[in-house]
Amino acid sequence: MTEGKRLQQMELPQMKSIWIDEDQEMEKLYGFQVRQRFMNGPSTDSDEDADEDLGIVLVDSKKLALPNKNNIKLPPLPNYMTINPNINSNHKSLTNKKKNFLGMFKKKDLLSRRHGSAKTAKQSSISTPFDFHHISHANGKREDNPLESHEEKHDVESLVKFTSLAPQPRPDSNVSSKYSNVVMNDSSRIVSSSTIATTMDSHHDGNETNNTPNGNKQLDSPTDLEMTLEDLRNYTFPSVLGDSVSEKTNPSSPSVSSFSGKFKPRELSALHTPELGNCFNVDQSLNSPGNRISVDDVLKFYYQCSETSTPRNT
């Protein structure tokens, strides 16, 4: 038997591994008898020994290909966090950060529920930056929150009274900002009825003179600026009708003379040239409406001069 097995091994081709897909190739290599043994499987122990001697391993067979023929029981896989302590610490830190970030938005809601709607608490959201207040110019009344505390009302009233009863030469730039900060809704929206850009100085006067050498502004005396109703009634406006109209008025009243002295007419030198004055024979010493030269007279004079002054032919 042993000699026959050896002869059979010698007849088989010597190769390390081969894949056989078709029956014809198997018949060519191993012959019909070997094919019968592959398909039917071993029947006796001697045949199994023969297969082992040949070194043939069937892929779909029930025989175990490993040398040990017992299943090895492996322990369960450990948790990946216990293997590396750094992974465990990083995971805990990430979870804590996430909880703290989400808890930041829940604490404000819990506080507002405990203390009720009377306590004004800022409700932050993800879309608004930190400590952000929106200034609204739409309305100065608190329409969103009708229930406001008595202390805030008292502060606003005292602030308005102070600004109205005690004016300063220059407006306080912080008054509007203080007022807007006091009037605030629960939705962190500042309702402002006035801003710094819209404030005006009520004490500004256009009759202010330039700065003196000492650096102080010198205003006109109150007597020069005061004007009574009698002065307005007795004041005669200038006209171009002639001296007859001016003689009809009553120049003897001291109030008229004092009031009219403030409004001096322009000098005649500013209205015409000396040539124009000689043409019309105007006496500059007289200061009456009849001596005044109108714009039409000036234009007419220059128009006549341009017509008469023609170039001479030599």
Curated annotation (Swiss-Prot):
UniProt signal peptide: none
GO terms of molecular function: small GTPase binding
Recorded GO CC terms: cell cortex; cellular bud neck; cellular bud tip; cytoplasm; cytoskeleton; incipient cellular bud site; mating projection tip; nucleus
Disulfide bonds: none
Biased composition (Low complexity): 251-260
Residue ranges of the region described as Disordered: 112-156, 199-221, 241-261
InterPro entries, alphabetized: CRIB_dom
UniProt GO BP: Cdc42 protein signal transduction; establishment of cell polarity; regulation of cell shape; regulation of exit from mitosis; septin ring organization
Tagged with keyword Cytoplasm: yes
Residue intervals passing through the bilayer: none
Biased composition (Basic and acidic residues): 140-156
Record localization: Bud neck; Bud tip; Cytoplasm, Cell cortex; Cytoplasm, Cytoskeleton
Source organism superkingdom: Eukaryota
CDD domains linked: CRIB
Oligomer status and interactors: Interacts with GTP-bound CDC42.
Other notes: Present with 1100 molecules/cell in log phase SD medium.
The protein's name in its UniProt record: GTPase-interacting component 1
Organism: Saccharomyces cerevisiae (strain ATCC 204508 / S288c) (Baker's yeast)
Gene coding for it: GIC1
